[in-house]
Structure formats: C-alpha cells, structure tokens
C-alpha cells in the first residue's frame, strides 16, 4: 500500500502482521517480528477493550519483547451514539483508555483511541472535523514525537543486541 503521509516520508515503516487470534496454531510470523520491531502498536477494539486473550499475549510476548509499546483502541465510531451527548461519549472513551492503560501497565499517553475507517474517509473527502473526531492526530503525534526521533536509538540497541550475541558466541567458541 502506498499512501503519501509525512510520517512515511520521515522513515516510518509499517509492517502489519496477522492478529494472533487469526493465526490459529502458527503464530510464528507475528511473534518473530516483536523483538525486532522499533515499536509495536497493539490494536484492540474499543467495544471489547482488553480481552483475556489480549492480556495473555501482551504479558507473554509484547511486554518482554517490544521496547516501545502503544495500545490503539480502534472503532471509536461505534461509540458515537446520537442519544449521548459529546461529553458522555468523550467520558466513555476516556474510561476505556484509562482501563486499557491500567491493564497493560502503559502510560495513558501511550493509549490512543481512534477510528481508522473514519480517519480514512475524512482524509479522502478532506473533512477536517471528521478527521479531528477520528482521533488519528493523537496517534500520528505519538509516532512523530517519540518513535521517529528514537529511530537512531532503536537501531543502535538492535545492532548492539545482534553483535552482542555474535561476540558471545565467538567468546564461547574461543573458550572451548
């Protein structure tokens, strides 16, 4: 997919792997990518929040394997109920963000609530109000302010990790 976005022009590369629950008994592709990812966006649906399965995956693979973690609560448009006031909707979204932050032991600033579908519709149609309501700007800001600038640090840690294991293997070979 080619999309002209400033984050992509600044070096952000996105690899979308299948969700673990969609993989059945062969999750190796997704799991093998976690330790090498510069950042991991853990996509959840806002209407279900963090399920028991999500929490198990988070605790077993994401927390120990990913250095930079962001939880993304997608589909906030499902909460846009015409019978609720904007303040009530905002309060419900904020509650779900707080719960997700607590469950995943993430700073609240690393939990974004978005509607990816509405963000795309807004971008295609040039609808600024819908784009703002989609919440995508918060996620883009998080990526732009923390992930892209940290790319050099992330790459340095990855090289150190790779070279460190090679040096250790060489040291063991020499010792034996």
Question: Model-derived features: where do they sit?
Answer:
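Globular "head" domains of long coiled-coil molecular machines
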Residues: 1-155
């Amino acid at each position: 997919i080619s999309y002209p976005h400033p984050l992509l022009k600044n070096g952000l590369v996105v690899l979308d792997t299948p969700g673990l629950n969609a993989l059945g008994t062969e999750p190796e592709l997704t799991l093998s990518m976690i330790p090498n990812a510069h950042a991991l966006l853990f996509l959840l649906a806002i209407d279900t929040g963090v399920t028991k399965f999500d929490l198990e995956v988070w605790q077993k693979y994401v927390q120990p394997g990913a250095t930079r973690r962001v939880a993304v609560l997608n589909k906030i448009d499902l909460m846009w109920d015409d019978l609720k006031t904007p303040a009530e909707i905002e309060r419900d979204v904020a509650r779900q963000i707080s719960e997700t932050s607590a469950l995943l032991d993430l700073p609240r600033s690393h939990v974004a609530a978005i509607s990816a579908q509405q963000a795309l519709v807004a971008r295609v149609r040039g609808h600024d109000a819908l784009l703002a309501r989609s919440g995508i700007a918060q996620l883009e800001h998080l990526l732009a302010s923390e992930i892209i600038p940290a790319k050099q640090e992330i790459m340095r840690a990855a090289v150190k990790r790779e070279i460190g294991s090679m040096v250790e293997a060489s040291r063991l070979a020499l010792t034996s």
